[in-house]
A protein has these predicted regions:
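N-terminal type II signal-anchor transmembrane helix
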Residues: 1-55
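Residue-level preference for non-acidic, small/hydrophobic
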Residues: 61, 88, 131, 177, ...
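Acidic helix-start/capping segments at beta-turn-to-alpha-helix junctions
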Residues: 101-119, 129, 259-280, 317-320, ...
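A penicillin-recognizing enzyme superfamily signal
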Residues: 315-337, 346, 359-361, 367-386, ...
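Glycine-rich, acidic and aromatic/proline-enriched surface loops and short helix-turn segments
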Residues: 130-141, 183-190, 207, 211-223, ...
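Short pre-catalytic segments that frame enzyme active sites
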Residues: 62-73, 196, 200, 225-229, ...
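Non-catalytic structural connector segments
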Residues: 254-314, 323, 327-329, 339-340, ...
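Peptidoglycan glycan-strand catalytic modules in the bacterial/periplasmic cell-wall system
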Residues: 50-252, 364, 454-456, 465-469, ...
Length: 687
């Protein structure tokens, strides 16, 4: 500050004081002077909440990520050491406990000292005034203009600051003001508040700061830039010792205590302890963190509120399952593979929720696109070219529910069928107006529904689709978990998937040619594992606010999407895939030998592949798909884009699932496949 202007400011304040009657003492005089400014404490809401860090944890309380605008952890007075309070008072406002917001004696002393020296050697701002200035700068300011106004060099700002400081002193105790000040101010290196500063520089708490540590932090408030101990260690050390001297002068320390503290080195950490804001810091849980933020936003708690609110979000993520899921997808797919990735989601059905316990992608969650990193929601948004034959389970479920087929009934398996009224095209040489389907590979001419679910021929499921109707099958798919298919615009920005499928009577629906949300696919698995009951997938166990109040959003009611007996029959019927079906090799490779309900899926031309599976306590789905700018056929070993595709759901997708299941099944129980009510075993004939 130019010394002339500084002197003018101080003189201006004193002139205002001097023009008032002397009767009533200095306090009355300063209060009258301050009354020339119209603002009062209510105009800035000094009782407003400070911006605090919000924390996202896994289900065990381990921190996944933090979100903040200002990195601040607020603590109560009894969690701030008396030593740091004494240090701040000694160096910044030694008459703090005697004045009433504005220190007239200190102002006169500063004026005399500065005019005598010809420079600004002493300030005149009390801790109350500093609190007001910092509050206006860090809390009240909404834009650069407000921030400039909070720091401008003007008589008006100084008078306003004085008025508000007096109001502050009228409304709060000295300890409340000092605690607010220590929780508010910046200590540099992104640390706001004394608790954050203690963690940043010393990896300790505000309650446990030593005398030397407290003195260093108290001294830094004067100029965090010029007293940064990492950039200007000598200046920081000198300032710390000045604070120690001030503590002796004010009676807070004995000379011997001062000497002992002054003999200590700076003692700061080798580097300041920082905590990045956002999901990038969540590492392998980055995609899950992104999903949590999206879920919270959908449930009324947006990211902007999280960045200031000081919330604690305890999520459903199970660290052991997450570790296994991440390791499995990284084993099966390279993080930097061109144009293709592998996602995996796992859900644990509970009494009243479907808890997302793991979410993994072969991609790294990050901003380095050249290294294959991305922040796109690859694990929880509709993408790719579909889950393929996984969708056959919807036809099987509806046919079982309608009594059109039993698990042990015999289905005819023609190599090729042509059907009218279910779309055009399909296999080569399809007649005009006909939908033509062929099997991929060679099959017996007949087999049971169990065998068909395990080995996945195409033609019998198209015939089942004809019998029960496309409309009912797509409605069941939505009820079981593909809820986004019913959302307006989900197909082309204007029409929903459901509307388009029904309007065209899309025969190919049961062959899974449509983009799918990997998380929704996993929730279909969870609904079947949960005896046909759908619950919205949830990533959150609890949300508490800064005061510890539970504000957890209601995740909604569960629904019986499919009759319990039908769901159990289907789960039983899906038990052959890992034993003698398309997932047999993958299960064996992972040393999995227990019961599991499963279904593989591969789309036309091997553009994507999926796997869905579940045991009673854990359900999941994996999905390999084109995630780049071009759509190409996919190959296995390694997973990659290629000219002639040979990827199937029983390859990388199934292997990733079974590897994860082998590592984690003990955490979720297991047991035999569900029993089947006799009415779902045989109907006598396929009707």
């Amino acid at each position: 500050m130019p010394r002339l202007l500084s002197a003018v400011l101080l003189i201006a304040v004193l002139i205002v004081v001097a023009t008032l009657p002397l009767v009533g003492a200095a306090t009355f005089a300063t209060r009258s002077a301050a009354d020339t400014v119209n603002d009062d404490l209510g105009d800035i809401d000094a009782n407003a909440s400070l911006p605090l860090v919000s924390t996202i944890t896994d289900r065990n309380g381990n921190v996944l990520a933090r979100l903040y605008d200002q990195r601040r952890y607020q603590v109560a007075s009894d969690r701030i050491s008396d030593t740091v309070k004494d240090a701040v008072v000694a160096i910044e406002d030694r008459r703090f406990y005697d004045h009433e917001g504005v220190d007239v004696r200190g102002t006169l002393r500063a004026l005399l000292a500065n005019l005598t020296s010809g420079d600004v050697e002493q300030g005149a701002s009390t801790l109350d005034q500093q609190y007001i200035k910092n509050y206006l700068l860090f809390i009240d300011a909404e834009d650069d203009a407000d921030r400039d106004a909070a720091t401008e060099t003007s008589i008006a700002r100084k008078l306003r600051e004085m008025k508000l400081a007096i109001d502050l002193d009228r409304n709060y105790t000295k300890d409340e003001i000092l605690t607010r000040y220590l929780n508010l101010v910046s200590f540099g290196n992104g640390a706001y508040g004394i608790e954050t500063a203690a963690r940043t520089y010393f990896d300790t708490s505000a309650a446990d700061l030593t005398v030397a540590q407290a003195a260093l932090l108290a001294g830094m408030v004067q100029s965090t830039a010029n007293l940064d101990p990492y950039i200007y260690p000598d200046a920081a050390l000198a300032r710390r010792n000045t604070v120690l001297d001030a503590m002796v002068d004010t009676g807070y320390l004995s000379p011997a205590e001062r000497d002992a503290a002054a003999a200590e080195p700076l003692g700061v950490l080798e580097e300041p302890r920082t905590e990045p804001s956002g999901c990038i810091s969540a590492g392998d849980a980055g995609f899950f963190c992104d999903y949590v933020l999206s879920w919270l936003d959908d449930n009324g708690l947006d990211t902007a509120e999280l960045a200031t609110g000081g919330y604690t979000v305890k999520t459903t993520l199970d660290p052991a399952t997450q570790e296994a899921a991440v390791a499995a997808v990284h084993t099966e797919a390279a993080a930097d593979a061109d144009g293709v990735s592998l996602s995996a989601n796992y859900i644990a059905p509970t009494d009243n929720a479907h808890e997302v316990v793991a979410m993994a992608s072969s991609r790294i969650y990050g901003l380095d696109a050249d290294a294959g990193q991305t922040v796109l929601p690859l694990t929880h948004s509709a993408l790719g070219n579909g889950a393929g034959s996984v969708f056959k389970l919807f036809a099987a479920a509806q046919a079982l529910a309608d009594g059109k087929v039993g698990l042990d009934d015999t289905l005819q398996v023609p190599q090729r069928i042509e059907v009218a009224g279910m779309g055009d095209g399909g296999a080569e040489n399809s007649p005009v107006g006909m939908y033509c389907v062929e099997n991929s590979g060679t099959y017996s001419s007949s087999m049971t529904l169990r065998e068909a679910l395990a080995t996945s021929p195409n033609t019998p499921f198209i015939e089942l689709e004809q019998k029960v109707g496309v409309d009912r099958i797509v409605d069941l798919a939505v009820r079981l978990g593909l809820r986004s298919y019913a959302e307006p615009g989900s197909f082309d920005g204007e029409n929903s998937v459901v509307d388009v499928v029904k309007a065209s009577n899309m025969g190919s629906f049961v062959l899974g040619p449509l983009a799918v949300d990997p998380l929704e696919l996993a929730n279909v698995s969870a609904s079947l594992a949960d005896n046909g009951r759908w619950c919205a997938p949830t990533p959150v166990l609890s949300v508490t606010d800064r005061d510890g109040r539970d504000i957890t959003p209601d995740s909604g009611d569960c629904e019986q999407a499919l009759d319990r007996k039908v769901a159990n029959a289907l789960a039983n019927g899906m038990g052959g895939d890992a034993v003698s079906g398309t997932a047999e090799d993958a299960a064996r490779a992972a040393s999995w030998s227990g019961p599991v309900s499963a279904k593989t899926g591969t789309t036309e031309s091997n553009l994507s592949a999926a796997f869905l599976g579940f045991i009673p306590g854990l359900a999941g789905a994996t999905y390999a798909f084109n995630d780049g700018g071009s759509v190409q056929q996919l190959c296995t070993g390694p997973l990659r884009q290629c000219g002639t595709g040979n990827l199937f759901g029983g390859n990388e997708p199934a292997r990733a699932f079974f590897t994860t299941l082998t590592a984690t099944a003990g955490r979720y129980g297991g047991g035999k496949l569900p029993d089947v009510d006799s009415q779902y075993l045989r109907t006598g004939t396929v009707r």
